[in-house]
Structures are given as structure tokens and as C-alpha cells.
Amino acid sequence: MTLSPYLQEVAKRRTFAIISHPDAGKTTITEKVLLFGQAIQVAGTVKGRGSSQHAKSDWMEMEKQRGISITTSVMQFPYHDCLVNLLDTPGHEDFSEDTYRTLTAVDCCLMVIDAAKGVEDRTRKLMEVTRLRDTPILTFMNKLDRDIRDPMELLDEVENELKIACAPITWPIGCGKLFKGVYHLYNDETYLYQTGQGHTIQEVRIVKGLDNPELDQAVGDELAAQLRDELELVKGASHEFDRELFLSGEITPVFFGTALGNFGVDHMLDGLVEWAPAPMPRQTDGRVVEASEEKFSGFVFKIQANMDPKHRDRVAFMRVVSGKYEKGMKLRQVRTGKDVVISDALTFMAGDRSHVEEAYPGDIIGLHNHGTIQIGDTFTQGESMKFTGVPNFAPELFRRIRLKDPLKQKQLLKGLVQLSEEGAVQVFRPLSNNDLIVGAVGVLQFDVVMSRLKSEYSVEAIYESVNVATARWVECDDAKKFEEFKRKNEVQLALDGGDNLTYIAPTMVNLNLTQERYPDVTFRKTREH
């Protein structure tokens, strides 16, 4: 049976994001992946803040200055017979809810681990989010051109800390100055590493077979013997790769390499296009939507301001779930019930825009947004349904925001509400006073908000510390009990940017006590958009 042209396009798509702790090498790996996809000819390395070769995926002004990727950008490139969509996620010490939300728009994730450090804090947090949907995970152990921890130990740590089984696909031969390459367990081939070839795709020398005397000549007798010993151990002690278990998020194929030296990235990409799922079905409030359906549907998972410094526009990023987008098609924005003609959707190559003529399930397209689109919005060809699973996450950090010029209160509120619709930050207005409290998942979000208020809304503001430890969205089925709760806790209650009632707790102890005192009230950590 031959697939229809539409289904062939769907089957070609692979949509993934990279998750890692800051400085594990995510931006470098993004560069190298794009290089293999022929999207950029010479990969611009991130380091050297003053250098003019900026990495392609970091494009907002603040990112250019700091050398970090604040905003989730989207890049599409061909690889083998597939079209790969890579969603870049902010990886810096400081990231935001956007990072969490981006993970709801992909079918698979690549986890990048610094092999000298192992599993780190941010990686744990992001893995928790992927668990909400049992997303399949591939793993890349990076930085083999440095001295690393014992590879077996690294696998044990991933298994114990992240509760996912590891199936090594490649195995390293030496590390640091002695790094010689990797052996592929399933192809029975050794790929030899050459230094100094990081900016281009290098011709790799391949030695077939583990017992081939060429291997001993190439890496030295000692390392060759060590490799054979380690592989005996690995084959006995580790898991075999199983695609079904990979698709259900229970096992991760592990690749070793160095993104900086551009070695091993292609092995990982080969695994990605071969094993990662084509666009997956999505749950709505009424039914499951399959990618094979001909009618268009999609949801907005992030809104981005100022991709074009010359224009104050905002772009809503939409994941296509089913059907084909064609230029000029009419779509219904389900939340408002309005039909809109989309004639100028964008595709991305990180900050370079090109207008898109068509897009298929798994693709990400950008819609121009003048304040009418919100995160979580569903677009269809008329069907009234809402995709679920694009949450707001309870902030972990809070500041009170004050104006330098009290006459600009209106602009400040407008700016904050727009930034909160975009998911840049969350805003809370306490019921008992006129304060404005800003909540974020990472500290850098506060700086981003401050600089954007200044450049986009001409508002100069300052932050003050505020006695808030955490926030929870509250609801209750019993109206009478809810009224009593609201009356007695007015001082702790606030409305968020979307006018949802929120309990703002000064301490975790206070939150726990309040939850015990009001068992009928639900306190939520995430809220569907």
C-alpha cells in the first residue's frame, strides 16, 4: 500500500527539543545538528562573547549580549529522508516556563549530559515535565574531548536518578586528550575521532569489526584491549535497545561524543530519524486528534515578542497537530469563536523568517499576533475543541514591581498583562492592596521583563522583595465554603493576568496549614491555559 502524498509528508516529520543543564553544550549541539542538516555551512561557536560569529539560534538583543538562548526558537532542516523540527529551549541558569511549555509541543526529546558532571539539577526538572506525557528520550553524553567520569557510572546515575533504563548504542574509546572515537554496538564499527575538525563535517575513518587488527593500530593496543573488556561488561550489564520501550519513555538510547569536536552528533541524528515517532495524536477536551486527519488543527504553545527589532510585533508559535496549512486558509480561533484568514504564517530558521506556503503535522508555524492570541489557543477548521496539556506552572520566585514615574501605571499594567499572556512572566494583583507582584520560574525572567517594559512600553520600574514563597490556583465546587474561604483569606488572595483566583502563600508552612484547614478547596500547581 502506498501512502497518499499527505501521509508521506506526515511520516517524514520528526519534532524534538533538547533538554540539558546550563553549559552541558546544548547550543553547540544545536549548531552541529543544523550543520548536518545543511542549514548552516559553518557552525558559529557560542563562546567568546565578543566574537562576531554569533550562534545561529540565539537572537534576541539580550541573548546576543549574554551569550545565552533566552527564547525558544524553532529550526527546520532535512536529514536523510526526514524533515526535522528542532525546538530550541532556553538552557541558561535561568530559564522560564517557556522551556516547560515547549516540551508539550514535541514528540521526542534529546537529553544532553556533560559527561564530566553527570545528571544535574535542571535536567531533573525538565525530565519531570517530559514525564507528564511519557515523551521518548534520546541521550547524548557530551564533552568526551575532556576528561569524563566512568561511562558505566554515568549510565547508572541516569538510571537511578531519572528512573529511565539506558541502552548504550555507541561506546567511547578513551577520553580527554586520549579520546580516540566510539564503537557502535549495533553496527559493529569503530568511528575514529580527529581533533580540530569541529566547524565542518569531517570524513570519519571507520574500522569494521571489533577484532580487526586495524583497530589496535588506530587506537593503540592498550585502549583497544580496554575497549574489548568494557564491551564484555556493557553487553552483560546494560539493556538492549527496544523501540517499544523507547516510545513509551521507559528506555533511552545513549550516544557518546563531543559536540564541540562535531563527533558523534550524526550517530545520534541517525537514531533520531530512525526511531523517534512521526507526529503523535493529541488529546482535546472531547476526543483524540490523529495526525492523519485531513482537517487542520493546531495549538499555540508560546508567544514571542519582537523577533523583528524593527517592528513591535508578537508571534504566536503554533504546533500543527493534523491537516495541512495552506496560505490564505480560514481558521477558527476556538476560544473567541472568530474565523481568521491566515495568509502570512512564518517558518523559522532561528530569527530569519520566511513566509510559509504550507505546513504539515509536527511543523511549527508562526502567526502574527496583535494581542488577540493567547497561550493554549486552539485553531481548527470549524470544529469546537480545545487541546489540553499546555499548562501554566506555579511560579517559584516573586518580586513586587514599582514605577519610577507613578503616572505610567496604565502602561505598566498593559505591559505586564501582555507579557503574562505571552508566558514571559506571571502577574498577580492582590485583592487587599494595589501592589503588582510578578512571579517567575527563573530569575532571568525578571531582567527580561524589566528590559522589555523599558524598550517596548517606555516604562521604567524597579523591583522590591516581597514576602511570597509560592502561589497556587484555587477553586472549589461548594460556593458557600468558597465564599467563607475567600472572606477569611482575603489578605493572601490575588488575581493573575487572566483574572484567575490565586492563593499567595508567605511560607510553605502557611500553604500546608491552609490546605489542611480547607480540605474542600483545591490548590493547583499547574493550570490549563
Swiss-Prot record:
Coiled-coil positions are none
Q: Does the keyword Amino-acid biosynthesis apply?
A: no
List, alphabetically, the InterPro entries matched.
EF-G-like_DII (IPR053905), EFG_III/V (IPR035647), G_TR_CS (IPR031157), P-loop_NTPase (IPR027417), PrfC (IPR004548), RF3_C (IPR032090), RF3_dom_3_sf (IPR038467), RF3_GTP-bd (IPR041732)
Record has Nucleotide-binding as a keyword: yes
Subcellular localization, as worded in the UniProt entry: Cytoplasm
Pfam families in alphabetical order: EF-G_D2 (PF22042), GTP_EFTU (PF00009), RF3_C (PF16658)
Q: Name one GO molecular function term.
A: GTP binding
- Which biological process terms from the Gene Ontology are attached to this UniProt entry? regulation of translational termination
Alphabetically sorted, this entry's keywords are:
Cytoplasm, GTP-binding, Nucleotide-binding, Protein biosynthesis
Q: Which SUPFAM superfamilies match?
A: EF-G C-terminal domain-like (SSF54980), P-loop containing nucleoside triphosphate hydrolases (SSF52540), Translation proteins (SSF50447)
Q: For the tr-type G domain, which residue ranges apply?
A: 11-280
Give the CC-aspect GO terms.
cytosol
NCBIfam families, per the entry = prfC (TIGR00503), PRK00741.1 (NF001964), small_GTP (TIGR00231)
Into which family does the record put it?
Belongs to the TRAFAC class translation factor GTPase superfamily. Classic translation factor GTPase family. PrfC subfamily.
According to its UniProt entry, the function of this protein is described as:
Increases the formation of ribosomal termination complexes and stimulates activities of RF-1 and RF-2. It binds guanine nucleotides and has strong preference for UGA stop codons. It may interact directly with the ribosome. The stimulation of RF-1 and RF-2 is significantly reduced by GTP and GDP, but not by GMP.
HAMAP family to which the protein is assigned, alphabetical: Rel_fac_3
UniProt name for this protein: Peptide chain release factor 3
Q: Which organism is it from?
A: Cronobacter sakazakii (strain ATCC BAA-894)
